[in-house]
Amino acid sequence: MGFAFDSRFDEISGGDITLKIREKAEGSRVQLPYYYYDILAEGVPVGRISIRTGDNFHTYYNGHIGYEVNEEARGHSYARRACELVLDAARFHGMTRLYITCAEDNAPSYRTIERLGGRLLEICEVPREYFAWYEGIPRHRIYQLDL
């Protein structure tokens, strides 16, 4: 039997933003099961967010949450607010802490993580064994968010 997704998390709303499920995947040996959403602000797409459940070696560098906000929609805290909305899904799946990561020099992203309450664990080189490693991959900021 595969990973048990919960349809209650297919659409999550809070304030003027809504997350609508784009894809669900059971994951693999390397990639964890995830929910992947479009972020909508008053019905207009402004970005995407994913929440990955479980843990493995790669999670530490990839993080449990990944987000991107369209360039023209930046500066409205959509990433932070979307992150807050997916936390219940993480809790539902038994998560008690999340890793959230970003490139060392990605100031908008690390400010988002810090505003969420993420605690910086380290800034590190990413090992070659990480599934998404590539030549020149930037150093990563690794944060932990306790749920």
Describe the function of each predicted region.
Residues 2-60:
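Acetyl-CoA-dependent GNAT
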Residues 34-36, 137-142:
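Short hydrophobic/aromatic beta-strand or adjacent loop that forms the aromatic wall/cage
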Residues 55-65, 74, 93-94:
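A conserved beta-turn-beta hairpin within the catalytic core of GNAT-like acetyltransferases
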Residues 67-69, 75-88, 111-115:
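Conserved acetyl-CoA-binding loop-helix of GNAT-fold acetyltransferases
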Residues 91-101:
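Conserved GNAT acetyl-CoA-binding A-motif
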Residues 101, 119-135:
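Conserved catalytic-core motifs of GNAT/GCN5-like acyltransferases
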